[in-house]
Curated annotation (Swiss-Prot):
Keywords: 4Fe-4S, DNA-binding, Exonuclease, Hydrolase, Iron, Iron-sulfur, Magnesium, Metal-binding, Mitochondrion, Nuclease, Transit peptide. This is Exonuclease V, mitochondrial. It is an enzyme of class 3 (hydrolase). Binds 1 [4Fe-4S] cluster. GO terms for biological process: interstrand cross-link repair. Residues 1-12 form a transit peptide. The keyword Iron-sulfur applies. One of its GO terms (cellular component) is mitochondrion. Single strand DNA specific 5'exonuclease involved in mitochondrial DNA replication and recombination. Releases dinucleotides as main products of catalysis. Has the capacity to slide across 5'double-stranded DNA or 5'RNA sequences and resumes cutting two nucleotides downstream of the double-stranded-to-single-stranded junction or RNA-to-DNA junction, respectively. One of its GO terms (molecular function) is DNA binding. Monomer. The gene is EXO5.
Length: 499
C-alpha cells in the first residue's frame, strides 16, 4: 500500500532567483573548489584582458564582462582610446572593421575596449603585404611618393622654418590624400577603361550607425561615419577580349585629362551593354588550403560587396562623388578650398607628371576644368589673390625642378613646356581639384552594375591561385551585414557566440 506525502513550500522559496552580480562575490561558495592549488595554479589575465580590466578600474580577479551600462558604444570608445592616434583625431572606420562576425564578436569587443593596441606585424602578415605590393606593381607602374618626398625634404631642410610652413601648407595628410586620389582613384579608373581591370583602388562610403544604412545621397552623407577601404581588384566581367590591345595606354604619357575622361566614359558606356562590374579580394595563405569556417568566408564576401556598393554609389553622378570626396577630406580636418603648398604641388607633379602636368598648366592660366562644382568653388582665386602669389618658383626654379624630374623620369618629359608653372598662377592648386578629377573618374562606372564578387585565395610562397570563390552581388545580404555592423559599433549588441 502506497503512502502519499504532502509538502508545503515556504513562499520565499517560490521567488525567482536574483540575477548574478557581474563579479566573483556571487560565486563565493564555490571558492574552495575553484581556488588555486599546487595542482591547479591561478591563471593571470592575458595582456589584452588586463588592458580591458584596467580601463574600467577592475582588479585582475574580476570577471571580464563589465556592466553594460558603464560601456560607451564601441565606435565612441574606438575613437577616444586607440593605439593609432589618427583614429582619435580623425574618427573613421575601415571596411575590415565592419566585419564584426568574421571570427568572434567578443574578440572584437575586447580589441576595442582594450584600446585597440597596435599590433606588431607578424612574419605572415608582412609576407601578405609584400605579396599584394608585387601584384600591384606588376599591373601599375608608379613612382614611390616617399622617394620624391625625401628629395623635397632635402631642399626644404635648407630653408627657414617660416618658409617651410608656407610651402607645405595643407599638411602631410592633404599631400597623402591628394596622391591617393590621383594614383588609386583617377589612374585606376582610367586603367579599367583601357585594360578591363585595376588593382588597389581606393573607395569609401558613409555608414549611419543608428539606422545601419549606407549613405546614397548628399543629404545623408553627414549622418554617417566615414568608412575607407582598398579594393584589391576591380574588373569588367567578362574580360573584354582584345580591349587592351585595341586601346593601348601608357600611364606615363602626357594626358589631356578632359578629353581622356570623356573618351573613357564613352567606352565604358558602350561596354556596359554586355559587361558587368566585379570586385575581387585577394587573400594570402601560407599553404594550399582555404578557410572552412562559414563566418570567415561570409566576411570575405561581405568585404567585396561593401567595395562594390561604394563604387556603385560614388559612380551614380559626378556631383555626389565630388561632395563625398570633399567630405572625406573635411573629416580629416583639411580645407579643400585652401591652396596646397608649392612643395607638395611639386612633389605630386613629379610623381604623376604625365597625368597632372596639363591640368597644372590649365590652373596656372586660370582655365576652367568644365566641372561646375569645382569651377564655382575656385572662382574667387581668380579675382581675390591669396597673400602671396602662387607659383612653383616659390619652391624651386625651373632648372632645379627639371633636374628633379629627370632624376625620376630620365629625359622622357624633357620637351614638355612647363614655364607657365613658374609664373604666377591664376588658380592655386587645392585639394578640391583632386576631388573633382577623382569624381569624374568614378563617374566612368555610372552604367556598369555589379553582378558578382569573388574572393581569390593565393599561395603566398608559390604565387599560385589556390581557389576562387564567387558569389552573386546581393543588396539584401549587404544590408543585413551593414545593419549588424552598425548594431555592434553603434550600440553594442553581440551574440556572445564563437561563430
Amino acid at each position: 500500500m502506497s503512502r502519499v506525502l504532502t509538502f508545503r513550500v515556504p513562499p520565499e522559496q517560490q521567488q525567482a532567483p536574483k540575477p548574478l552580480l557581474s563579479d566573483r562575490s556571487s560565486t563565493w561558495p564555490l571558492l574552495p573548489q575553484l581556488a588555486p592549488t599546487a595542482v591547479r595554479p591561478a591563471s593571470p589575465p592575458s595582456p589584452k584582458e588586463e588592458l580591458v580590466l584596467n580601463v574600467f578600474g577592475r582588479g585582475p580577479d574580476s570577471l571580464l564582462m563589465p556592466p553594460k551600462h558603464s560601456l560607451p558604444p564601441p565606435f565612441a570608445f574606438y575613437t577616444q582610446f586607440n593605439g593609432d592616434a589618427s583614429y582619435m583625431a580623425e574618427p573613421r572606420l575601415s571596411v575590415t572593421k565592419l566585419l564584426v562576425s568574421s571570427w568572434c564578436e567578443l574578440r572584437e569587443y575586447y580589441e576595442v575596449y582594450a584600446g585597440s593596441p597596435r599590433r606588431v606585424p607578424t612574419a605572415r602578415l608582412t609576407q601578405g603585404t609584400d605579396y599584394h605590393r608585387v601584384l600591384e606593381e606588376r599591373s601599375h607602374r608608379a613612382i614611390d611618393p616617399s622617394t620624391v618626398s625625401a628629395r623635397v625634404e632635402e631642399i626644404l631642410g635648407e630653408m627657414p622654418e617660416e618658409r617651410v610652413l608656407a610651402l607645405t601648407q595643407g599638411g602631410s595628410m592633404a599631400f597623402k590624400l591628394a596622391h591617393q586620389w590621383v594614383e588609386q582613384i583617377l589612374v585606376r579608373c582610367l586603367a579599367v577603361a583601357h585594360t578591363g581591370y585595376a588593382r588597389e583602388m581606393h573607395l569609401h562610403g558613409f555608414l549611419d550607425l543608428t539606422s545601419g544604412e549606407l549613405a546614397t545621397s548628399k543629404s545623408t552623407i553627414g549622418q554617417g561615419v566615414l568608412v575607407n577601404g582598398i579594393a584589391d581588384m576591380v574588373r569588367l566581367e567578362p574580360a573584354p577580349y582584345g580591349h587592351d590591345r585595341a586601346l593601348p595606354w601608357d600611364p606615363q604619357a602626357v594626358l589631356e585629362l578632359g578629353p581622356a575622361l570623356e573618351g573613357a566614359k564613352a567606352r565604358m558606356d558602350r561596354l556596359a551593354t554586355n559587361h558587368t562590374l566585379e570586385v575581387r579580394d585577394v587573400k594570402t595563405r601560407a599553404y594550399n588550403n582555404v578557410p572552412k569556417q562559414s563566418s570567415v568566408v561570409e566576411a570575405a564576401r561581405d568585404q567585396c560587396m561593401y567595395y562594390a556598393q561604394f563604387l556603385t554609389t560614388l559612380a551614380q553622378n559626378e556631383e555626389y562623388a565630388y561632395q563625398s570626396l570633399v567630405e572625406n577630406f573635411t573629416r580629416r580636418h583639411i580645407q579643400t578650398s585652401h591652396p596646397l603648398g608649392e612643395a607638395h604641388a611639386a612633389a605630386l607633379l613629379i610623381t604623376n607628371f604625365g597625368v597632372l602636368v596639363e591640368d597644372y598648366k590649365a590652373l596656372a592660366r586660370g582655365d576652367a576644368l568644365s566641372f561646375t562644382p569645382f569651377d564655382n568653388a575656385t572662382t574667387f582665386y581668380v579675382t581675390e589673390q591669396p597673400p602671396e602669389a602662387y607659383s612653383l618658383a616659390n619652391f624651386v626654379d625651373e632648372p632645379t625642378f627639371r633636374t628633379l624630374l629627370a632624376d625620376f623620369h630620365g629625359d622622357y618629359f624633357a620637351d614638355v613646356d612647363i614655364s607657365v608653372l613658374f609664373r604666377e598662377w591664376k588658380r592655386p592648386l587645392t585639394p578640391a581639384y583632386f576631388c573633382a578629377r577623382a569624381a569624374q573618374a568614378l563617374y566612368l562606372f555610372e552604367k556598369l552594375k555589379p553582378s558578382s564578387v569573388c574572393v581569390e585565395y593565393h599561395n603566398v610562397k608559390t604565387g599560385r591561385i589556390i581557389e576562387c570563390k564567387s558569389f552573386p552581388f546581393d543588396k539584401h545580404t549587404l544590408e543585413e551585414a551593414s545593419k549588424r555592423a552598425a548594431q555592434f559599433l553603434g550600440r553594442y549588441s553581440t551574440t556572445h557566440k564563437h561563430r
